[in-house]
């Protein structure tokens, strides 16, 4: 029996900076265990600040590409993780996914500040997303272990 990798979509409201950070951490922590896709509601070029703070964490996301929202709606995903600031942004609804999680994370592009202040915001966002990705991986491992114990 062929096992397919679970497909995970990280969907950021705003630009894809947060979803690219989440994708980078998931790939770093799990290798190719998941098929991972990033989407930002607002199309944007690569985000140098996100790449820079991820490089500080030892992860290169500069080569990651985002999928368009329209294309993501055509794909089946086992997990959809929306990343938005629930105080300022509406969490997208994704009705056709098996598992949907909503992560409340501020949009680093929507905060004030320049230079080092902005970089500090990106670092806090990076660290928060890292914790959430680690929890997702741990929860996924527990689900997989419980499936194996049933068999």
Where are these regions (language model features)?
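Phosphate-binding/catalytic loops
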Residues: 88-151
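Alpha-helix C-terminal capping/helix-to-coil transition sites in glycosyltransferase folds
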Residues: 74-76
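Residues at the C-termini of beta-strands that transition into short coil/loop
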Residues: 40, 84, 104-106
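Conserved active-site segments centered on acidic
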Residues: 1-71
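Short glycine-rich anion-binding loops that position phosphate/pyrophosphate groups of nucleotides
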Residues: 14-16, 85-88
């Amino acid at each position: 029996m062929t096992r397919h990798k679970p497909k995970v979509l990280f969907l950021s409201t705003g630009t894809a900076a947060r979803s690219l950070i989440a994708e980078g951490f998931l790939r770093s922590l799990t290798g190719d265990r998941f098929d991972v896709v990033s989407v930002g509601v607002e199309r944007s070029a690569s985000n140098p600040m996100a790449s820079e703070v991820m490089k500080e964490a030892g992860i290169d996301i500069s080569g990651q590409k985002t999928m368009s929202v329209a294309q993501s709606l055509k794909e089946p995903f086992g997990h959809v993780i929306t990343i938005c600031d629930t105080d300022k942004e509406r969490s997208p609804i994704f009705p056709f996914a098996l598992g949907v999680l909503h992560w409340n994370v501020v949009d680093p592009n929507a905060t004030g500040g320049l230079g080092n202040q902005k970089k500090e915001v990106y670092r806090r966002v990076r660290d928060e997303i890292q914790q959430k990705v680690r929890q997702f991986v741990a929860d996924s491992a527990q689900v997989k272990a419980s499936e194996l114990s049933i068999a």
